[in-house]
């Protein structure tokens, strides 16, 4: 058996999840609305390549997510998911898309109205882990000042920001069609 290339030696970054959880819980409903994926690190679970648009609807307990965009085969793709507090009481969210598995997710930093820096990591046996990072924006573009805030947040937990790949967004994207899918 071969180890997938996204499973790497080392441990998940040290994140003060308790502090973030305490700060964000009162504002959680402010995360609702549309988020565009500005950039991400290598993630085999992200099946949408371009024009990634995420709609988060908060029902008081969890977010229902509708993610749309252009898949790697060039076709429009919709994925449904949920984002909810960890069911075992750990201070982080769990993200769970159809045909996948629930994974921990931490909002490292956000102002709720412009940007969000997201980190997901799972530690495995024998000193291996998988981590995935995202930069989200409320619009198809993200001002450099907010990109820098996310870069600083990721550098603060020793995530190599050169791993990020910018997501194609903008005038070539069928956002109006995506809203109706």
UniProtKB/Swiss-Prot annotation:
> Which InterPro entries does this chain map to?
Calycin, Invtbrt_color, Lipocalin_ApoD, Lipocln_cytosolic_FA-bd_dom
Cystine bridges: 12-121, 51-173, 117-150
Q: Which GO terms describe its cellular component?
A: cytoplasm; extracellular region
Tissues/organs with expression: Found in the carapace.
Where it mainly occurs, coarsely classed, is secreted
Q: What keywords does the record list, in alphabetical order?
A: Chromophore, Disulfide bond, Pigment, Secreted, Transport
Pfam families reported in the protein's UniProt record? Lipocalin
Is NAD tagged as a keyword?
no
Query: What job does the chain carry out?
Result: Binds the carotenoid astaxanthin (AXT) which provides the blue coloration to the carapace of the lobster.
The record describes its quaternary structure and partners as: Oligomer; Can form dimers (beta-crustacyanin); or complexes of 16 subunits (alpha-crustacyanin). There are five types of subunits: A1, A2, A3, C1 and C2.
State the family it belongs to: Belongs to the calycin superfamily. Lipocalin family.
Q: What is this protein called?
A: Crustacyanin-A1 subunit
Protein's organism: Homarus gammarus (European lobster)
